[in-house]
């Protein structure tokens, strides 16, 4: 049995007539929280360096030395060698530790930490007289920081943040890149370390590296690092940091590399996942047009975050939503509703649900751009998660649309798939569907076509489904279904009400004029 608070929350979601568009959008943001959470499988938070070729990191002399097979060192030997004070021994043992940590399967991160090697590895980061040792230590620490939060914490507690930030400006590009990689892992752990990096002034040296001379692979790492600095929202990144990073992200949005575009779009999605003020700073960069272009990309890794970003933007004000409409979002959404990936269908429907929460002129633009038919198709045969978002789109549309707009949706066949979904187990979605049906009946009442709609609902098997909900476990569902039946389907009483004369201005009228009735026939 739901608690009073749950019931109140459901009632708020059910009763949305009379709410303004901002309230409708805000409610949708809360309901689709699972859409808004950063999904760990969509963009990688942390990465281990397991595959750099040795010839990139060793001097020719060291390569010659490594060509002779030597048995791997034990952890005890590594600890002794790293603490020996002998440069050659330090390097050999640090490299052995790095190799252990770079194993693809079960790297012994905790063993290295418990052996007390992190302070020594951090110390080696400042050995500017030995760039190979610096690099090996940086690589080892990068891989430890790619682990759990506790493992990342051990790297931070060892003093690695200032040491790595100073290495961003290293004259050796491979060391600088490894430092960025390590810092990206630290930032990816969460808002605490993200803000620690920002407070240590990591952004200026990082942005200085975004230039045409930076190799592509390195630029990818920098972009990923920047996206991690934009990530997380408890708390959000400081606005001062956002304003520093945004111009460079805007520049990177025009790159032609798919990995850079993907990470930049993810960064934009994090920055727009917040208050209207945060959405506004992104919209004001003028980047919305480019985001819409990227929604046409054949690459899923680009479509997903660009769609997410635009979806976030249309949770904002009517003006912010209009910026997305003016940039052409309504032209690309029909094809995304039919995308082969259900996750894209779901996000597209979510975006539409927020546009549908807008004023009637924005709803009219949805109609003009041909969104109703693919939306009904999705409601009919889409993946269930996508169908749930489509249900929200229909309910918001019928809440804020004009009578004529509601009729157009009904004429597109929305009733049958909507009624069919009343048999699902998700109480929240059933309430939203009943809300949409109630909204459609209100439109029919205004046209004097309530009786026709009753017959249509009955022919589609809807009455039977609504009646069945009177035995539903959820009392909110039961009450909503009962209210519909009592108001519109109570047998002879309903017929009597339908035949009662209606008081017009000058006389009694039984129904609206025929012309109007034909124009808006259900």
From Swiss-Prot:
GO molecular function: nuclear import signal receptor activity; nuclear localization sequence binding
The keyword Transmembrane appears for this protein: no
PROSITE patterns noted in UniProt: ARM_REPEAT, IBB
Predominant location: cytoplasm
Region described as NLS binding site (major): spans on this chain: 139-231
Bias kind Basic and acidic residues: ranges: 7-22
Record-linked Gene3D superfamilies: Importin-alpha, importin-beta-binding domain, Leucine-rich Repeat Variant
Region ranges (NLS binding site (minor)): 308-396
Disordered: annotated segments: 1-22
Intervals of motif Nuclear localization signal: 42-51
Span of domain IBB: 2-57
ARM repeats by residue range: 109-151, 152-196, 197-235, 236-280, 281-320, 321-362, 363-402, 403-447
GO cellular component terms, semicolon-separated: cytoplasm; nucleus
Record keyword Transport present: yes
Keyword entries, A-Z: Cytoplasm, Nucleus, Protein transport, Repeat, Transport
Cell location: Cytoplasm; Nucleus
Record-linked InterPro entries: ARM-like, ARM-type_fold, Arm_3, Armadillo, Importin-a_IBB, Importin-a_IBB_sf, Importin_alpha
Gene Ontology BP terms: NLS-bearing protein import into nucleus
Similarity-based family: Belongs to the importin alpha family.
Subunit field text: Forms a complex with importin subunit beta-1.
Function: Essential for selective protein import into nucleus. Promotes signal-dependent binding of karyophilic proteins to the nuclear envelope.
Free-text note regarding domains: The importin beta binding domain (IBB domain), which is sufficient for binding importin beta and essential for nuclear protein import confers import only, but not re-export out of the nucleus.
Protein name: Importin subunit alpha-5
Originating species: Xenopus laevis (African clawed frog)
Chain's gene name: kpna1
